[in-house]
A protein has these predicted regions:
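Conserved N-terminal phosphate-binding loop of PLP-dependent enzymes in the Aspartate aminotransferase
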Residues: 2-465
Length: 465
């Protein structure tokens, strides 16, 4: 079956819940950030904890509190959150229903290994209710990368094969199998396992092949995959692994015909299609599964991030034809499926349904697309803009013909927007944005105003106008 089952519409238009901070006062920057308390606290932490991310090194602010779409740092500055942590807090920070569910579970039962608990049963049945198609097997984990590893084991068990095809610039985690699916930098590249192969995927802004009319030619990519299967593998490919939308790479969207054609490509060759939906699932792209946007279902998928709204809970899900293979791999982990994690996930799913957040994410998407539509014409450094649900990307370039990435501009825009009170995620020359699904439109307008001001100021500084 190649079609996603239609899902019932979420009830009503989204209305902000009353618990959230008064966003009319956000942003508020009484102390130029990073302020003295943030700098002092981060310096102490950095002496002990090594390997902070690039975004922290660029702007070492210390966050002390979050509510809804607002964050407050140790110096009392308040920010609009356009990061959702790292694509995690889909319901905003500290949603009371989720917080209360976790607290109640912590008072009742914190860990029962992999025994069934009432709240675990509720989560498993709820997943079967909301997911499209014929998903019939689930395992619960505590991080995206462990769920990905479980999915790789499942694909091996289901097919008896051990090779995998993945794509340049996808991201799947930092354990050995997950790292082998991607190439992030030279350190990780040295640890890749044999039998893992990466291929280019269609990028409408940077196509490798085009039709005479200038549109991207998806068939050329599929021809390359077919040739690589014959010439570059031993013929033992278990699965094709893909992020439906590339998150780490900068919210890069596939052309509309790619996922359906990749589904057909896998079906014809007896290869499992494994979609890593840790980032894109649970409403982030406006659907329970991002693949639904293209009326396509994977055979195996992973869920995480927004599944627990910040609490570490992830899942591997498998469609009925491959469900028996899940019995061959152990579901036992120290923390996967613990009562607190399951409570967070159940509460998060219920809030998405009750507050109509799938529908609201698509309303936000429509606003963001309208707002950014003229940016490539309006700004010299803006090469491309894209959005699906609450996943946004703005690509900055030095030259619109060569499309040379403009990393320096990306850094400047990131810092300038943060200084104005917008918390978000850098990615070199690509501006990544992932606001919570609960964000009111008027707050989204404020956030986009800040970003546009930062882009315009950066252009002036770099003498690009």
């Amino acid at each position: 079956v190649n079609e996603a089952s239609p899902r019932p519409a979420c009830p009503g238009r989204y209305e902000p819940a009353p618990y959230r901070l008064d966003l009319s006062t956000c942003p508020s920057i009484p102390v130029p950030p990073p302020g003295p308390r943030s700098r002092e606290m981060h310096a102490r932490a950095e002496r002990i904890m090594r390997g902070y991310s690039g975004q922290v090194r660029l702007f070492p602010v210390v966050f002390a509190e979050g509510k809804g779409c607002a964050l407050q740092d140790a110096d009392g500055n308040r920010y609009i959150d356009f990061s959702s942590g790292i694509y995690v807090t889909n319901l905003g920070h500290c949603h009371p229903k989720v917080s209360e569910a976790v607290a109640d579970a912590a008072r009742t039962l914190m860990n029962a290994h992999d025994f069934t608990t009432p709240i675990k049963l509720r989560l498993l049945e709820l997943l079967m209710e909301i997911l499209p198609g014929d998903f019939a097997g689930v395992q619960l984990y505590d991080s995206g990368t462990t769920a990905v590893e479980a999915a790789l084991r499942t694909c091996r068990a289901a097919t008896g094969k051990g090779e995998f095809l993945s794509f340049f610039r996808d991201f799947h985690g930092k354990t050995l199998g997950a790292v082998s699916l991607a190439r992030m930098n030279s350190v990780y590249a040295q640890t890749r396992m044999p039998g893992f192969y990466m291929l280019p995927r269609p990028d409408t802004y940077r196509p490798l092949w085009q039709r005479p009319d200038g549109s991207l030619d998806t068939e050329k990519y599929l021809d390359l995959y077919d040739e690589f299967l014959r010439e570059g593998t031993s013929g033992q490919v278990a699965a094709v692994v893909i992020e439906p939308i590339q998150g780490w790479a900068g919210s890069i969207m596939p052309p509309d015909d790619f996922l359906p054609k990749l589904r057909t490509f896998c079906d014809k060759r007896g290869i499992i299609l494994f979609a890593d939906e840790v980032l894109t699932g649970m409403g982030r792209a406006g659907h329970w599964l991002c693949c639904e946007r293209w009326n396509t279902l994977p055979d195996v998928a992973t869920l995480g991030k927004g599944l627990g709204n910040g609490f570490p809970v992830t899942a591997m899900i498998v469609r009925k034809p491959y469900a028996d293979a899940v019995d061959k791999i152990s579901a036992s982990t120290s923390y996967g499926g613990n009562p607190m994690a399951c409570a967070a996930a159940v509460a998060s799913i219920e809030v998405i349904i009750e507050e109509g957040l799938l529908e609201h994410a698509r309303e936000l998407e429509a606003y963001f697309l309208r707002r950014m539509a003229d940016w490539p014409k309006k700004y010299v450094i803006v090469g491309d803009v894209r959005c699906m649900g609450c996943l946004l990307g703005v690509e900055l370039v030095k030259d619109k013909v060569t499309k040379e990435p403009f990393d320096e501009a990306g850094k400047r825009v990131y810092v300038k927007a943060f200084e104005r009170g917008l918390a978000w995620i850098p990615a070199g020359h690509i501006l990544r944005m992932s606001p919570p699904l609960v964000m009111p439109i008027e707050v989204a307008v404020k956030g986009m105003d800040i970003i546009e001001e930062a882009i315009a100021e950066t252009e002036r500084e770099l003498a690009m106008i």
